[in-house]
Amino acid sequence: MLRRLTDRKEWKFFAVLPKADPPLAAAWWTVLLLRGVLPAAFAIAMGVLVGAVQGGHSLAAPLAFAGAVFVLLQVLSPIHQAISSNLGDRTAAWLYDRLTEACVRPPGIGHLEDPTLTSDLTVARDFDLGMTGPPLSISMDFIANGMVEMIGGVASAAILVRYAWWAPLLLAGAWLATHWLLRESAIWRDRNTEEVRGAQRDADYAYRLAVDPPASKELRLFGFGGWTVDRFTVRRTRLHELQYAATRLRERPVVWSVLLVVSANVVVFWLLARAAGEGRIGLGEAVVYVQSAVGVSMIAFGGFSWALDGAAAPVAAVLRLEPAMRPAGALRSGSRRADPAPAREIRLRDVTFAYPSTSLGTGDAGAAVLAHFDLTIPAGSSLAIVGQNGAGKTTIAKLLCRLYDPQSGAIEIDGVDVRDFDLASWRSRVAAVFQDFMRLELPLRDNVAPAGAPDEIVRGALVSAGAANLAALDTVLARAYDGGTDLSGGQWQRVALARALAAVALGAGVVLLDEPTAQLDVRGEAEIFDRLLAETRHCTTILISHRFSTVRHADRICVLEHGRVVELGTHDELMALGGRYRTMFDLQAQRFNVPEEEAGTTYDVLS
């Protein structure tokens, strides 16, 4: 029983508050309890005052008592609101700290791409942005007010016991029944069902198409304006229909709630009135009991339920993610220090790897992306990897960077399993540019060398990447900052390339480029790739690209299909072979109807 209670997300939410800020949490609970009992105390104070007036006694003490309680009722509310707001902010910060640590601390990235963790990660990440409910700084006040009313209702019921033991039970039972009767319909009304959320997403999508700048060009060019308006109207109408249907769901529960509450209150107030009329209770007692009977209504169903549910869900999500992310992103780290560069070769030996499967629903591995994969890359050479989407090209890049480890087989550097190297040592020897590279809202210097580097290295990397005149090193790459600037997609790609070249200058001996020039123009691509090969001529370079005008310059080209090497050789060898590489190369060439012998100067535009 106790275990079931402590496993509830509401319990976990309240348990987190003192961890986030112990003094503030203590103050929040103290003021909450005071506010909860003050309505009952005020009822007693008014009864004492009325009794004193009726009996002709001194009014000084009763008035002072009633005045003090009244002042506290007025003063404690704004104080509690301020405490709630601060505690909500501290709790949100505590949760974000825990979430950030849980996401960043594991050395791999499996926990960030595991579909079984996606739902919790989304809830935990977005909870305080106002997307799924009010931020904690606001919802804490709703929760506080709801709990004050609950405590006030219980305190009022306790006073009413003195009149008749059954009276508080009757009233409390009627008001508590509203929680059971209205909860499910309230969840529907608050758009917490999948159907309502789906309709909201559909309507929001059409709305964003209409008002957001990125879609404005195509919207007008292809004449989608009318379609967008019609789509928004239909989806929004559907959403309103669902909301209306949800409101109709409340009709029967509301009727039953009204009948129960009215019946219980009629019985209690009628008997109180008769007792007062017959003189069985005094006027002062009648005032106390009437106010207490009214106070019991504070335990009725209200905003407390949905506010607590919305605040408790992300807490439970973060607490679930912490232990789940650690093993999902775990990687073994050895003790050997990696050499600056491979001396003989990089070998992927009998490597099998699969990502966690959504279909299995357990985080177990799904279909293998690479199966018994073998590939040897001579040290100091350049290898281009090509293939259709899903062939496993980017997966190889992730494995070489040790963002994942294979389920079987090994990646060996000069015969040494890469898992035997110290993880940080190995990664310092790898310079990588991924398709979704970082765009840091930091100065240009820190974008090129996030871990720090002499300005000479930073400037040299920018020159080699064709970004020498991009901006001053201290310029923040975001317009939101004073003196900041924004960059185009191609300019950002040059910064990412400069980051890799700076890593090479700092000692990296393996260069991994995943679509490194996808956002550059034709002339810029040819220029940058020639520079890259020149700057990394002493390194082992792995290039992943769909542009055959780029990959043809590599020492060797590897064609992947369904996680296996189907062709391997130089550009000339693969063209002479007449296999898949030749087919893909000719397919790009035919789009421009250019003779093959001119391909080296014209295919740069293809992607």
How would you describe each model-predicted region?
Residues 338-340, 388, 397-460, 526-538, ...:
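Conserved post-Walker A segment of ABC ATPase nucleotide-binding domains
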Residues 9, 15-23, 125-139, 192, ...:
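An intracellular "coupling" helix at the cytosolic face of ABC transporter transmembrane type-1 domains
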Residues 121, 368, 467-495, 499-516, ...:
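ABC-fold ATPase nucleotide-binding domain signature/coupling loops
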Residues 530, 538, 546-607:
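C-terminal portion of ABC ATPase nucleotide-binding domains
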Residues 224, 268, 295-326:
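Cytosolic ends of transmembrane helices, especially the final helix of ABC transmembrane type-1 domains
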Residues 1-39, 61, 80, 117-119, ...:
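Membrane-integrated ABC transporters
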Residues 437-481, 501-508, 580-583:
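Conserved "ABC signature" C-loop
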Residues 26-80, 150, 154-186, 263-287:
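Transmembrane helix-loop-helix hairpins at lipid-water interfaces of multipass membrane proteins
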